[in-house]
């Protein structure tokens, strides 16, 4: 029996990066997946992984679309057991140069989008007897970095805070909530394969002296959504090659 046999996951941002890697890992472990993305690339994920995956176009900042996403998962699979709020954007600019529009955009996707996925994820999971919510934060939500990403960091810190609140509020109702905090992971958003060579200062900031791979984050996500992780909730878990340890 595979670790996630019979489980259904809703994964946002599933057209690329860590979310696509999670989709692969979950299907490998026996889960079915609703793969959501705004880009259209969720169709590629579904084509790659076959009938276990249903694609869904979704802007996570639009509440009606998030509600429709969960409705589609229930229509397709009959239940939801795990929600992975991965979709996000990056932004880099010195704090004094960030425009109000840039601030709003980052907060809209990286904080509001995760809030909506958590809110409607909780409501959906309650109707299915409970489950797991994994919210993507960042090591930037824990510590400041050498890069000018203050607004991004603020949004990711917010994700940590309300993920903890969700864990406390809904723990007795069968819902676990966990914040995953990737460090320098070589995805398209961070520059893709070879990004470690272009940003050596980030690599040197880790204990392992290398960048991480999306699959390494996906392995953690798969475990956390399994029954083996049943006593883990309210946790903030860095996947960063020891980056936060070097900054402690």
For the regions a protein language model found, what residue spans apply to each?
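Residue(s) in the substrate-gating loop at a strand-loop-helix junction
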Residues: 138
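Canonical Rossmann dinucleotide-binding motif of NAD(H)/NADP(H)-dependent dehydrogenases/reductases
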Residues: 4-34
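Active-site helix of classical SDR
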Residues: 118, 155, 163
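Alpha-helical segment proximal to the catalytic Tyr-Lys
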Residues: 123, 168-169, 230
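Short C-terminal tail/terminal secondary-structure segment
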Residues: 143, 222, 233-248
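Short, small/polar-rich loop/turn modules that mediate ligand/substrate recognition or access, typified
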Residues: 171, 176, 232-234
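Substrate-binding pocket helix/loop in short-chain dehydrogenase/reductase
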Residues: 94-95, 102-107, 202
